[in-house]
Regions:
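Transmembrane-helix bundle segments that line or gate the permeation/cavity pathway
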Residues: 1-2, 21-39, 53-85, 102-114
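Extramembrane terminal tails and long inter-domain/linker segments of multi-pass membrane proteins
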Residues: 1-23, 81-93, 210-227, 272-299
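A near-ubiquitous, low-amplitude feature marking generic local secondary-structure context
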Residues: 3-10, 16, 140-143, 153, ...
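Generic secretory/membrane-interface signal
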Residues: 9, 16, 20, 61-62, ...
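Alpha-helix initiation/capping motif
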Residues: 10-15, 47-48, 54-57, 151-152
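A broadly tuned "polar low-complexity/structure-edge" signature
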Residues: 10-13, 17-20, 25-38, 70, ...
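Long, contiguous internal "core" modules enriched in hydrophobic/ aromatic residues
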Residues: 24, 43-51, 86-251, 257-267
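Juxtamembrane/interface segments at transmembrane-helix termini
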Residues: 38-45, 71-81, 146-147, 198-208, ...
Length: 299
């Protein structure tokens, strides 16, 4: 039957790209927005405001590139991706529309800035769209999903924490060498601790809730152990140890943790989708095993 056919290798890629795009762009925008508008010295505020407006173009282009890649892979193998898309949870609704409104708001502000001047009130509206978009997508994945492995508060927590991490490393890069560097380092340190605790809570849930979640856990620690190792060791433990070393022992550059956290968050999004299984996939796996057994008996 078609419903039990092997899924396309590209089936999950559009969702990975779209979710990572939302986390990256909204996180970076929110960081630059808060860094700018929580500055109370006039000279520094004006300097950061100019940087904020110039960064909008890059944030917008990043969102468009990821969104375009998601559409490309969505239609690359249209029969397979269409079938898989119909089985996905209804996440392409309000939260996705808010994300498109967020990108549209960025475009309008970019045009206004180059033609006349930035419209200050629009910045606050865009920030609300960014926050609403990521909170909405986090809630949708953790509440309205058909995957047992997603229906847990740790799903929303992981998405929100990942968004903050991506935004904070962007701030660490943009304001390297300033007084904000250590502020961002402390924020990243706190978020990394929360992410480790979230991962621990998620593993407890996966190991106890149902057969499907136990299968997901076996996939994470079995066929996807290399990618999980990248996520856990390179994306969590190494930056945590490095930040503690820099903050308390040595005065090294904080920039190396940018790559660690970026790769770690990307690998987390990949694992989030490819390790999620439902009854359909279990049925396909069972049918495949039965076919292999029958073939072996005939031999």
């Amino acid at each position: 039957m078609e419903s039990h056919s092997k899924p396309s290798p590209y089936a999950k890629l559009p969702d990975i790209l779209l979710l990572f795009s939302q986390m990256l762009t909204t996180g970076v925008y929110s960081t630059f927005f808060l860094t700018t508008y929580l500055t109370f010295e006039d000279a520094i505020f004006q300097q950061r405001l100019n940087f904020y407006y110039h960064s909008l173009t890059y944030i917008f282009l990043t969102g468009i590139i990821f969104f375009g890649l998601a559409l490309f892979y969505q239609y690359r193998n249209s029969p397979e991706t269409k079938d898989d898309a119909e089985e996905e949870p209804p996440k392409k609704s309000k939260s996705s529309r808010l994300y498109l409104y967020f990108l549209a708001g960025l475009l309008i502000q970019i045009i206004l800035y180059f033609l006349v001047a930035g419209f200050e009130l629009l910045n606050f509206f865009i920030f609300l769209l960014a926050a609403s978009s990521i909170l909405g997508i986090a809630r949708t994945f953790s509440v309205k999903s058909k995957y047992d492995s997603w229906n847990h508060p740790t799903t929303a927590g992981g998405i929100i924490e990942g968004t903050i991490s991506l935004g904070t490393i962007a701030g660490l890069w943009a304001f390297a060498g300033t007084d904000l560097s250590r502020v961002f380092a402390w924020i990243i340190l706190i978020i990394l601790v929360f992410e480790i605790l979230t991962l621990w809570a998620r593993f407890r849930y996966l190991s106890r809730w149902s057969y499907l979640t136990q299968e997901t856990l076996q996939m994470l620690l079995g066929s996807h152990i290399a990618l999980f190792g990248v996520r856990f060791i390179f994306g969590l433990i190494m930056p945590l140890v490095y930040i503690v070393w820099v903050l308390f022992i040595s005065n090294l550059s904080l920039l190396p943790i940018i790559l660690m956290i970026f790769v770690g968050e990307l690998s987390e999004r990949i694992l989030f989708f490819i390790a999620a299984i439902d009854q359909t996939q279990i049925t396909y796996k069972s049918n495949e095993n039965i076919s292999e057994n029958i073939g072996g008996e005939q031999e």
